[in-house]
Regions:
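Extracytoplasmic soluble-region selector
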Residues: 1-104, 109
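Short, structured secondary-structure elements
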Residues: 61-68, 82-86, 90-311
């Protein structure tokens, strides 16, 4: 068997509605079989809906999104549904970008009115805290509130993003995400160098893909190439891959180590093939006590699936 097909895949349903899910098993020779009554089901939010052993879903009055995971012979499918709040959404703010368009479309679909556009005083306070990690100065607030420039909000955002306050604030955030912590006194040189590298990258507005590549492909001494400090805290292929997926791709892969990811398309094969990318990472003692030199060996990137021992490669 190569997969399962769940029908319907997603629906907008009313409160207290019911839905029967059907499950079809798909085999490599092209034939299919009904697996509805032998698959297993699990809802991820039992306050919104519950599902029985036959795939019959019962919704409650709680609005929101719910997913029902369907498992059969190691394959996974998902049914997704939304119970709308039900309020009329006739007017939305003017979209400023494609993210606004997607958000407003979702709000209309689930009947959730958007918040009103904030006033100028609220905006400058919020955006200063969010971007620079501080309240606006008296001079900044006075200049902004007195301005009649229709583009003043965009200009304020650009000014804050170009400031050292932004670089300082987000360097702390990224430092935590990249596990830049002092595990010992001998780690201090790498810690300070890595923090400075992150801060400078943000202040120079280094492209996101370039920033990620510099971390993942880092090699050498941690004092000379601070980005290599990341490898000091994430030592195994699995940890390196899981951190990479979550930090840079916004995807949690942990579940796929043992089985198909319950609410995503990722399989065990994907998990170990991705992990294989880091199989070429090596380390050796550095010149200073407690430090390491990171290097990448010249070999085929591969690892074995722990379940069946099959070798998998990074494609």
């Amino acid at each position: 068997m190569v997969g399962v097909e769940v029908y319907p895949k997603n629906r907008l349903v009313s409160a207290n509605a019911e839905q029967q899910i059907s499950v079809t098993a798909i085999y490599s020779d092209g034939h299919t079989e009904d697996a509805t009554h032998i698959a297993t089901y699990e809802a991820n939010d039992k306050e919104i809906a519950e599902v029985d052993d036959t795939g019959h879903v019962k919704f409650f009055e709680q609005p929101g999104d719910v997913s029902v995971m369907v498992r059969y012979l190691g394959q996974v499918g998902v049914y997704q549904a939304s119970v709308p709040l039900g309020a009329p959404v006739n007017v939305t703010p003017q979209p400023r970008n494609f993210i606004d368009e997607l958000v407003f479309a979702k709000l209309k679909r689930v009947g959730m009115p958007p918040s009103a556009v904030s006033d100028d005083a609220t905006f400058i306070r919020r955006v200063s805290i969010d971007i620079a990690g501080r309240l606006p100065t008296e001079a900044e607030a006075k200049t902004f509130l007195e301005s009649t420039d229709p583009a003043k909000r965009d200009k304020l955002i650009d000014t804050l993003l170009a400031s050292t306050d932004y670089a300082d604030y987000f360097a702390n955030k990224w430092g935590a995400l990249l596990r830049n912590k002092r595990s010992s006194n001998t780690a201090m040189r790498g810690n300070y160098a890595f923090h400075g590298w992150i801060r400078d990258s943000l202040h120079k507005n280094v492209r996101y893909d370039e920033f990620a590549r510099s971390v993942l492909a880092a090699s050498g001494d941690m004092g000379q190439n601070p980005a290599a400090t990341w490898y000091r805290e994430v030592k195994t292929m699995q940890t390196q891959m899981e951190d990479t997926a979550q930090l840079f791709l916004g995807t949690r892969m942990q579940c796929a180590q043992c089985h198909h990811h319950p609410f995503e398309k990722w399989s065990q094969k994907d998990y170990y093939s991705f992990s294989a990318f880091f199989s070429t990472v090596g380390r050796k003692p550095g010149r200073n006590p407690g430090e390491e030199v990171i290097y990448h060996t010249r070999k085929v990137a591969q690892t074995a699936n722990k379940k069946d021992g099959c070798l998998l490669y990074t494609s």
